[in-house]
Regions:
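Structured binding/interaction patches within domain cores
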Residues: 2-154, 159
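Charge-dense, extended regions
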Residues: 148-198
Length: 198
């Protein structure tokens, strides 16, 4: 499946703003996952962050503004959770997508755009593994990334809301409740074992 990651050639011809919009589109499509897994942040917190980043597309984000966005991301309680048994771990993983988008806005170029694309695809793959068709979300996310890039090259700009209406986001909304319920049960069992050991 690694061979199916996007390459620099896929992004060729996009302006800095186009690269940023492609990355922000990934951030928006995975928004339902953050809302489903986050146990502390409100459901709109992530969306507001991505929308504010999107407002910067088309211009370079300076060092000071970039640091302000990074501090804002670091303030999310889920950030820093590195225990894959916990729900917050998956919310933290989603946050990696807008972080890469921020780096693109700050002038990170194609390499950061590729990192953003791969982060989104890895998450889609992780969720796909919990479904009967292990490639379903991966394939849908990959096709959506390519569709958005093609649209940008043709002068069509995605919006946060158009990304939420994508097949990927709609499918996530359908399958996430069951995935989260399973993960929550594993989390509760894990935490119970820890309490028992104490």
């Amino acid at each position: 499946m690694v061979d199916e990651y996007l390459t620099a050639d896929d992004f060729a011809g996009l302006s800095r703003g186009g690269l940023a919009e492609a990355c922000l589109a990934c951030s928006a499509r995975l928004s339902p996952a953050f809302a489903a897994f986050a146990t502390h942040s409100g459901p709109r917190d992530y969306d507001d962050l991505v929308r504010d980043l999107w407002a910067c597309a088309g211009r370079e984000v300076g060092a000071r503004e970039s640091e302000e966005f990074e501090r804002r991301m670091e303030a999310f309680p889920e950030v820093g959770c590195d225990d894959s048994y916990l729900l917050d771990y998956y919310a933290m993983s989603v946050m990696g997508i807008p972080l890469e988008a921020l780096h693109v806005l700050a002038g990170g170029g194609v390499e950061r755009a590729l990192a953003c694309s791969r982060t989104a695809l890895r998450l889609a793959n992780e969720f796909s593994e919990k479904l009967d068709d292990e490639n379903e979300l991966w394939d849908a996310e990959r096709q959506e990334q390519l569709r958005v890039i093609a649209g940008l090259k043709a002068g069509r700009h995605p919006t946060f809301d158009s990304c939420l209406a994508s097949p990927v986001s709609r499918r996530l909304v359908e399958v996430l409740p069951a995935i989260v319920a399973t993960q929550r049960a594993e989390q509760d069992e894990y935490l119970a074992r820890i309490r028992h050991q104490e």
